[in-house]
Each structure stands twice: as C-alpha cells, then as structure tokens.
C-alpha cells in the first residue's frame, strides 16, 4: 500500500495541463480511461531504476498509454536491445523510447 500511495503522490505531481497543451485533450482522456494501466506502467518504469520517470512520462506520455502487459513487453524488448546500461542510455537519449510507439 505504501508504494501505491507514493505513486499516487507522484501522479499528482504530473503537469497534466502541459501534457494537454502539447498532446491535446484526447490524450488526457486516454490517460483517464486507462488510468490503472498508466499508473502500473509508471510504477514499472520507476522499478526499473528511472529516477526521472515523471519527466520521461511528461515528455513521452504516449508510450505509457497502453495495457500494462503490452507496456512491459515493449519495454523489456527495448532493454534487451540496449543492454545492461539501459537506464543511462535512455536517460541520455530519450528518443530511444520512440521505438515503443
């Protein structure tokens, strides 16, 4: 329960107005519809060791809006491709996440 509570706090720190301005209202609606999956996807990203998961979420929001199983599969495939230093590689070049779209 503590982990979920912390995640909800993090979710509240997300700048949804910025996301809406960049991606449009339909993306906000999609996040709302798939809220539980989006939260699980952010949680998985944090568990992988990404310290700036919220910033990555705000910049690459579209990759997080999918069923959790699909997200995990895509992320794991990308990690296998990048290798052991995947956190550093992705944090230094966020465009690597474009493969998840």
Residue ranges and their predicted role:
Residues 1-101:
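Long amphipathic alpha-helical repeat/alpha-solenoid cores
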């Amino acid at each position: 329960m503590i982990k979920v509570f912390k995640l909800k706090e993090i979710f509240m720190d997300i700048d949804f107005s910025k996301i809406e301005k960049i991606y449009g209202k339909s993306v906000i609606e999609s996040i709302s519809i798939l809220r539980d999956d989006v939260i699980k996807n952010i949680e998985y990203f944090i568990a992988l060791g990404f310290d700036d998961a919220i910033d990555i979420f705000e910049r690459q929001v579209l990759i997080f809006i999918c069923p959790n199983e699909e997200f995990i599969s895509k992320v794991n495939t990308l990690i296998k491709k990048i290798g052991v230093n995947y956190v550093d590689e992705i944090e230094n070049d966020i465009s690597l996440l474009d493969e998840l779209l």
